[in-house]
């Protein structure tokens, strides 16, 4: 039996490799880990408690807030504020960023952007849901109040990013820019334990994930790419398999381990796509690039986009490098008019 390594031990060991490390990021990741355990507990008993269903209100995205959305948002906010290693957060569930104003928080150097519970509308039918997080160094001076500009940074400036998938087992996957590692929660000891070390996404995959019910609304480039995926060709091992859960974390997690592409394109009713650049796309882009994959808006690198708004949306193509590059080629050939570079 191999030695069990907890996430806490793993992070401390990695920190020891950098003598100048102060431990603030280690403490911050510990806070996220703690909140994930609390949310996991509530999800596991959701069917027995009065937390399934909607609150009857909408969040800033215009989506009906689920009770667990609100619960998860509050738990992560509380955990991140408690230790003072974060000066503020931006959440998919909040209209504006949240500033933490304790003396310790104001002098901290990190901000966190988070989707507290991705896919929560599926919780009452027992489909896996998740949490997505992203960490940046603030741009404003420590000791001052956090500003909007601290959050509106391109993804290539991320310090760390990760997600938690709450499913048949609960798993936390993260990167600090030195590879991707996954930790599975062991409820018997209350710890996340290293289960997937140095995750690498296959360069080529056989899975495509997209909501084909929206096919009629897709750009021509996406329609042509889907046709390519469905055509038989032994040389390229086609047709590919279609797998779509409707929870970004779950679909991304499967494709990360098995190889594949996840697509949420623009549409006639959503010209900028649906997914949020800051809360969903950038964190997953950082992870997939660190694992050897690629993330794009169909024409260019997701992490090079300069955000202009907290809740900005973007088309999204993420997964195995060769699959994403092939999808980009179809977009350039058949949907070039949608490329922002070609628009005034």
From Swiss-Prot:
Mg(2+) 2 binds at residues 115, 118, 280. The keyword Cytoplasm applies. PANTHER family: FRUCTOSE-1,6-BISPHOSPHATASE-RELATED, SEDOHEPTULOSE-1,7-BISPHOSPHATASE, CHLOROPLASTIC. This is Fructose-1,6-bisphosphatase class 1. Belongs to the FBPase class 1 family. Its cofactor is Mg(2+). Keywords: Carbohydrate metabolism, Cytoplasm, Hydrolase, Magnesium, Metal-binding. Binds 2 magnesium ions per subunit. HAMAP family: FBPase_class1. GO terms for biological process: fructose 1,6-bisphosphate metabolic process; fructose 6-phosphate metabolic process; fructose metabolic process; gluconeogenesis; sucrose biosynthetic process. One of its GO terms (cellular component) is cytosol. The keyword Chaperone does not apply. PROSITE patterns: FBPASE. Mg(2+) 1 binds at residues 92, 115, 117. Its EC number is 3.1.3.11. Homotetramer. It catalyses: beta-D-fructose 1,6-bisphosphate + H2O = beta-D-fructose 6-phosphate + phosphate. It is an enzyme of class 3 (hydrolase). GO terms for molecular function: fructose 1,6-bisphosphate 1-phosphatase activity; magnesium ion binding. CDD domains: FBPase. It holds the Pfam family FBPase_C.
């Amino acid at each position: 039996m191999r030695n069990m390594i907890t996430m806490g031990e793993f992070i401390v060991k990695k920190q020891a490799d950098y003598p100048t490390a102060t431990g603030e990021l280690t403490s911050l990741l510990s806070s996220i880990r703690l909140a994930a355990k609390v949310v996991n507990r509530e999800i596991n008993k959701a069917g027995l408690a009065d937390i399934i269903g909607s609150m009857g209100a909408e969040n800033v995205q215009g989506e009906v807030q689920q009770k667990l959305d609100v619960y998860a948002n509050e738990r992560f906010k509380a955990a991140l504020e408690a230790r003072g290693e974060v000066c503020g957060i931006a959440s998919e569930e909040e209209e504006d960023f949240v500033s933490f104003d304790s003396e310790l928080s104001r002098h901290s150097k990190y901000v966190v952007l988070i989707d507290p519970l991705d896919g929560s509308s599926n919780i009452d039918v027992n489909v896996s849901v998740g949490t997505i997080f992203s960490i940046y160094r603030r741009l404003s001076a420590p000791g001052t109040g956090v500003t909007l500009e601290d959050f509106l940074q391109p993804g290539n400036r991320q310090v760390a990013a990760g997600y938690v998938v709450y499913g048949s087992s609960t798993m936390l996957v993260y990167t600090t820019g030195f590879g991707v590692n996954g930790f599975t929660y062991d409820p018997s000891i209350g710890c996340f334990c290293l289960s997937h070390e140095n995750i690498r996404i296959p360069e080529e995959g056989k899975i495509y994930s997209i909501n084909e019910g929206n096919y009629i609304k897709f750009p021509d480039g996406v329609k042509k790419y889907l046709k390519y995926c469905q055509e038989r060709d032994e040389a390229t091992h086609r047709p590919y398999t279609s797998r779509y859960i409707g929870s970004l974390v779950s679909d991304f997690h499967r494709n990360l381990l098995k190889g594949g592409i996840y697509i949420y394109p623009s549409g006639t009713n959503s010209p900028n796509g649906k997914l949020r650049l800051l809360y969903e796309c950038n964190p997953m882009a950082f992870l997939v690039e660190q694992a050897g994959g690629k993330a794009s808006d169909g024409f260019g690198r997701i992490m090079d986009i300069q955000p202009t708004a907290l809740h900005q949306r973007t088309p999204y193509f993420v997964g195995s490098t060769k699959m994403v590059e092939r999808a980009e080629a179809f977009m350039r050939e058949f949907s070039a008019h949608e490329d922002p570079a070609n628009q005034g």
